[in-house]
Amino acid sequence: IAVRGLLTVTALAPPYFVLLGGGQSALQGLGALLLASAAAAFAGSYVWGRLSDKSSRKVLFLSGMLAAGFATLAVLAEVSGWAGTAWVIPVILFFFMLSYQGVRSARSVYLVDMSPEDARSSYAALANTAIGVLLLITGAFGGLLALAGPVASLIGFAALSLAGGLLALPLDEVENG
């Protein structure tokens, strides 16, 4: 639950990408950002699903690291002035959302594979309730950081993604083959 909780930031970060490099014109590039997000969902579901079936623990690690890296890359694009270029943030968002798809796939597979068959619904209910609370907490954290701007939020989200990915490393392998 701790790994999933830390990686919830991958679901909360995309609106902050919209705010980068745009100022008043941030919404003008929204179509490209939506296209990047949809393409990542399409491309990622098959690949991450197959990899999660082999090792959801490794997918949680890898997708946490990728999310941290691409959030950091977005921050670097903003501070270097590249975020205002029409294609930069959509490309970074595509890869960030690809990592989010990895988190989504692996967290579900890990939960199903680790829980005894007769207790899966109880495990899922408990995990989903805990994640709901953690989403509120990480959302509030992101909101507080947003007072300093989207860069601060993305830095915080990158740190939490990094922590979530690293915390996935010592998890047990639970796949059945």
Question: Predicted regions span which residues?
Answer:
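Cytoplasmic membrane-interface "Motif A"-like loop-to-helix N-cap segments
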Residues: D53-A67
